[in-house]
């Protein structure tokens, strides 16, 4: 029998990892940005997108019960269609996380410049340190990594709940009138931005083989995390609108202004701490899920089998993590040397993420029956993702190029069929 990933994750740790994967730095700026664009109506959009996120979560929860695999969403597509389809989706994902995660790290590190006059190279160094710490923790094993994630998420939730609580007394009903100052078109325009605040659920599914009871614990983790994330987003949007903490200052200043109404001048420092904690939690969870997905692809022979090795002592995909560290370094170096705009860098990975959701929902429509509530959730999510994907512009080509590269690789290599020794 081939060695397996170590089963050590509980539903508590799974919930923390899931929250970390979804709750990005967008929570620090989007409530104010969307309120500035759509007014109080932005709160309605946050509620609607929170509801839509349960469609995605419900579908993933059903799929995990069918195939609790380290392949995650690639395993579901493979099961629904064929091995090549799952492998091609895996190649699409190869072009998302390795670029997206360093961008997240840079975004979080950028917030430090609001309390210090950090130079660009210092911001890049801070981002690199966060990535390096996360990689090293994952190399030490999923148990330690999950415990750290749980601790960080507890700190984040405490700070956010405290910020909301101290702001509630300053909420006034008058700030919610008029509800639609810029019309429904403005409310619709912010929906795409808000949608990206609810992506990342799929990153917990590749950890299924490391849960004690994946069929029960993964769905529980997904639904608890979805409830927590939705509650935080909606309440933060509510107090942002109700205290009119938007439209007057820059991105981070809006949240700092909100927190300062209850916490005084320390608001900006609390905000920066939140930014760093949230950034680390996000990159940590994404590295966890993605490294297992790549390991599973190598295990199946869909990418070079060199990456299908586990550490003999920690049962972690050590070679994948090392390769990720190298790619992260290249992305940071490219950004530092050529000053590539982060928004431009993010367009490709964003399109790849949406494409992965479309493929996953299509797989669910085939695997689940129409009498299953998960089928209807998948249908709603499929339609929503397809519409959003159509607005990706030139980035539409990015997933297509990655898919073509994967198809070419499998065509030339023919897929490795030999059995592997999965332990170093």
Curated annotation (Swiss-Prot):
Subcellular localization: Cell membrane
Subcellular location, principal: membrane
Gene Ontology BP term (one): amino acid transport
Gene Ontology CC entries for this record: plasma membrane
GO MF, any single term: transmembrane transporter activity
Keywords (A to Z) from UniProt: Amino-acid transport, Cell membrane, Membrane, Transmembrane, Transmembrane helix, Transport
Keyword Transmembrane helix: yes
Entry-linked InterPro entries: AA/rel_permease1, APC_superfamily
Pfam families reported for this sequence: AA_permease_2 (PF13520)
Keyword Transport: yes
Stretches that traverse the bilayer: 9-29, 41-61, 86-106, 119-139, 148-168, 184-204, 222-242, 270-290, 320-340, 345-365, 377-397
UniProt membrane topology term: Multi-pass membrane protein
Coiled coil: none
Family classification: Belongs to the amino acid-polyamine-organocation (APC) superfamily.
Protein name: Uncharacterized amino acid permease YecA
């Amino acid at each position: 029998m081939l060695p397996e990933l170590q089963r050590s994750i509980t539903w508590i740790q799974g919930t923390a990892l899931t929250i970390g994967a979804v709750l990005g730095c967008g929570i620090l700026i989007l409530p104010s940005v969307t309120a500035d664009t759509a007014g109080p109506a932005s709160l309605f959009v946050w509620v609607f997108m929170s509801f839509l996120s349960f469609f995605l979560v419900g579908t993933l929860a059903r799929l995990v019960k069918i195939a609790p695999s380290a392949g995650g969403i690639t395993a579901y597509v493979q099961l629904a269609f064929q091995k090549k389809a799952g492998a091609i989706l895996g190649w699409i994902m190869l072009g998302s996380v390795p670029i997206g995660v360093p961008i997240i790290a840079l975004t979080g590190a950028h917030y430090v410049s609001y309390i210090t006059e950090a130079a660009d190279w210092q911001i890049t160094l801070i981002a690199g340190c966060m990535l390096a710490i996360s990689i090293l923790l994952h190399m030490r094993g999923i148990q330690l990594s999950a415990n750290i994630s749980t601790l960080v998420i507890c700190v984040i939730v405490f700070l956010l709940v405290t910020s909301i609580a101290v702001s509630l007394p300053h909420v006034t009903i008058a700030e919610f009138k008029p509800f639609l100052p810029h019309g429904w078109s403005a409310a619709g325009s912010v929906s795409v931005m808000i949608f990206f605040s609810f992506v990342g659920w799929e990153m917990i599914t590749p950890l299924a083989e490391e849960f004690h009871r994946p069929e029960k614990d993964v769905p529980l983790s997904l639904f608890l995390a979805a409830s927590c994330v939705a509650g935080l987003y909606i309440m933060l949007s509510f107090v942002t609108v109700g205290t009119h903490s938007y439209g007057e200052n820059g991105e981070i200043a809006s949240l700092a202004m909100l927190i300062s109404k209850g916490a005084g001048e320390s608001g900006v420092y609390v905000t920066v701490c939140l930014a760093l904690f949230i950034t680390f939690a996000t990159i940590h969870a994404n590295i966890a899920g993605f490294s297992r997905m790549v390991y599973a692809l190598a295990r199946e022979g869909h990418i070079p089998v060199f990456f299908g090795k586990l550490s003999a002592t920690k049962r972690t995909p050590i070679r994948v993590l090392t390769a990720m560290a190298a790619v992260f370094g290249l992305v940071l170096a490219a950004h530092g040397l050529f000053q590539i705009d982060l928004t431009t860098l993010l367009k490709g990975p964003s399109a790849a993420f949406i494409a992965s959701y479309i493929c996953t929902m299509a797989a669910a429509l085939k695997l689940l029956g129409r009498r299953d509530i998960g089928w209807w959730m998948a249908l709603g999510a499929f339609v929503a993702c397809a519409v959003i994907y159509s607005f990706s512009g030139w980035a539409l080509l990015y997933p297509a190029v990655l898919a073509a590269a994967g198809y070419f690789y499998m065509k030339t290599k023919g897929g490795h069929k030999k059995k592997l020794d999965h332990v170093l």
